[in-house]
UniProtKB/Swiss-Prot annotation:
Keyword Transcription on entry: no
Any one GO MF annotation of this record: small ribosomal subunit rRNA binding
Gene behind this protein: rpsR
Quaternary organization: Part of the 30S ribosomal subunit. Forms a tight heterodimer with protein bS6.
Entries under Pfam families matching the protein: Ribosomal_S18 (PF01084)
Protein name, as recorded: Small ribosomal subunit protein bS18
Domain of life according to the entry: Bacteria
Taxonomic source organism: Ruegeria sp. (strain TM1040)
């Protein structure tokens, strides 16, 4: 009898749905969840964010960095 292949459950985008949070450059607490300890933007394959929302998220993070709400790099 062969073993069943391992099935990894597909993650759902945290920004899709009715009561999903809006991506806003002023919401630094939300944006910090999608930045690594070194200050880099975490890729969507790890965070399970859809491609469209990942672009919005990256734009919001870059805007917040430009306005000095978020750091560019962490020491």
């Amino acid at each position: 009898m062969a073993a069943k292949p391992f099935f990894r459950r597909r993650k759902v985008c945290p920004f899709s749905g009715e009561n999903a949070p809006k991506i806003d450059y002023k919401d630094t607490r939300l944006l910090q969840r999608y930045i690594s300890e070194r200050g880099k933007i975490v890729p969507s394959r790890i965070t399970a964010v859809s491609a469209k929302k990942q672009r919005e998220l990256a734009r919001a993070i870059k805007r917040a960095r430009f306005l000095a709400l978020l750091p560019y790099a962490v020491k």
